[in-house]
Amino acid sequence: MEPFAFIIGLLLLGVLLQRTDAPVDLAKSLNFFVIYVSLPATILLQVPKIHMDMSALGVVLIPWLLLPITVAIVMVMTKNHPPEVRAALLLVLPLGNTSFVGIPIVQTLLGDAAIPYVLMYDQFGTFLILSLYGSAVLARYETGHIHKRLILKKLFLFPPFLMLLVAMIWGEMPSRMIPYLQILSATLVPVALVSVGYSLRIRGGIDYPLFTKALMVKLMVMPLIAFGILFAMGTEPLALKTAVLESGMPSMITAGALAIAAGFAPALSAALVGYGIIIALVTLPIIAYLLERL
């Protein structure tokens, strides 16, 4: 319980910082540090530990297999709603907070051995989906045009993705570098969680029936489907548990921010991100408990 209490404490610290005279762009600065320093260091340390087998492949495939399922559910859920509501859910529901929230929670619930699988799910799954699919949704509903060259440029200039390629090609880092990478990697959890807490905003005035259905899909239905797929594939236990937990992460803050900036149902988008994080602190330990009993 102590590690989980620490996670909640860091989130609350971020929330409390909202009430101080902290710089307006504090969350942006913290995110920048995580993306350019903490996460690349973690990737260089952890990814070489992955053995590419069917279990690792299953972890990578799950977010891509869940994507069309989620899109189909959203299309049905929003058939009587305006296009901006559909666009918001198409952005916010498929994309989970699989790094900033996912890494510390999975580390707490499953241990350090699960982190390589988290990084595989996050970088080859969530990040690529955000870059390719997320950009396409924004373009389709905001401008009507998809800029393929810009999408690819963002993809290959993203530091964590570049370090993922380096780690897979290079393998284990030189021993003299490891202590320094460990120091930088250790900043990921506290900085990321404080940033999430500082960014947490909850708005009223939402369509509660739709909000409830969307939250159930994100936090309950997706993990259940992921479990069914991975179980059928015969995925080894740690990889299965990691991918199921990652599939049940709350909506990505970046996806919510993009939806809000584009004017896609801002109140609904913010509520799914904000309340989703709070409720996931309950649902994820329950999912982990059930997985341990299977």
Can you name each region flagged by the protein language model?
Residues 1-294:
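Alpha-helical transmembrane segments of multi-pass small-molecule/ion transporters
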